[in-house]
């Protein structure tokens, strides 16, 4: 299997300039980004140690990804989907199609497409990606960049040299992916994407959910489902059916992060057990961001 890591998370926004300004208040360095030729979208990036957040906006509804347009129309700004990084996209697509042909999964990897971003300074960054169809909502897609490691990181910064984040953000620790049932979530990633869970099922009391974990070479997926009528996860299931609900990021100092965010007028809550900092989604353009100590 060559699906190795969480490559990036897409955050749908209506206005890129306003989104970039708000994310700077959250202590992120935000790149100048660029446009996707013939795809009707533009972006700004938050480049992390081993992945990135993509603030993505639609500027041509007829050319843009239909699911992205629909998401903004129906749900407003917030977490849209994410991409798995692949070291051999053709092999991963072939495995996906084999599992589909054998009736193991209803998900299907589509024909890989070439992608490109052009910065305002005319620098270009390319990739190949495969969207995944089937299911009832937008699915995580697969991507293989035209560069790796430090070369890829430099390209993500575009026209300017790499910069650190004022708040010291490190990596994507994990993604919270919600499903109506844990069985459905496990089958989705096991049978569709070929991932393997590790460990036993556990309970998250604060979210009233049952959960399992799928570790990757970089980061991990927390698949969680509500186990009570009072679970806060039920609202997400009712609205979205399934998908990414939260992003957990590392920082070097939780108390320092909380103080910095409060100084920017950002509303937060702290976990009484771990001290984790959760940014109010209203202050992150609808995205649920949780900070943990690296």
Which positions does each model-derived feature cover?
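Short beta-strand scaffold segments in enzyme catalytic cores
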Residues: 44-46
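Membrane-interface helix-loop junction between the first two transmembrane segments
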Residues: 31-35
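Glyoxalase I/VOC metalloenzyme domain signal
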Residues: 1-6, 11-30, 48-199, 205-294
């Amino acid at each position: 299997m060559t699906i190795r890591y969480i490559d990036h998370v897409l955050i749908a926004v209506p206005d890129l300039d306003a989104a970039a300004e708000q994310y700077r208040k959250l202590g992120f360095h935000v790149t100048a980004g660029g446009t996707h030729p013939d795809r009707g979208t533009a972006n700004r990036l938050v480049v992390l140690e081993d992945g990135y957040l993509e603030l993505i906006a639609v500027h041509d509804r007829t050319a843009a990804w239909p699911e992205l347009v629909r998401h903004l129309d129906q749900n407003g700004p917030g977490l849209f989907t994410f991409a798995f990084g692949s070291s051999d996209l053709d092999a991963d697509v072939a495995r996906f199609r084999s599992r589909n042909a054998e009736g193991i999964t209803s998900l299907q990897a589509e024909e890989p497409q070439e992608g490109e971003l052009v910065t305002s300074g005319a620098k270009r960054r390319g990739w190949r990606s495969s969207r995944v169809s089937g299911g009832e909502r937008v699915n995580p897609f697969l991507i293989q960049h035209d560069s790796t490691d430090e070369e890829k990181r430099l390209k993500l910064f575009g026209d300017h040299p790499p910069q650190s984040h004022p708040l010291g953000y490190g990596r994507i620790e994990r993604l919270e992916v919600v499903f109506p049932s844990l069985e459905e979530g496990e089958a989705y990633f096991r049978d569709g994407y070929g991932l393997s869970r590790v460990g036993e099922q556990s309970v998250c009391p604060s979210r009233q959910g049952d959960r399992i974990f799928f570790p990757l070479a970089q980061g991990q997926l927390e698949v969680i489902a509500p186990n009570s009528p009072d679970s806060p996860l039920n609202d997400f299931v009712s609205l979205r059916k399934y998908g990414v609900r939260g992003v957990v990021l590392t920082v070097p100092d939780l108390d320092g992060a909380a103080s910095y965010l409060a100084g920017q007028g950002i509303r937060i809550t702290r976990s009484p057990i771990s001290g984790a900092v959760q940014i109010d989604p209203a202050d992150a353009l609808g995205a649920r961001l949780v900070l943990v100590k690296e």
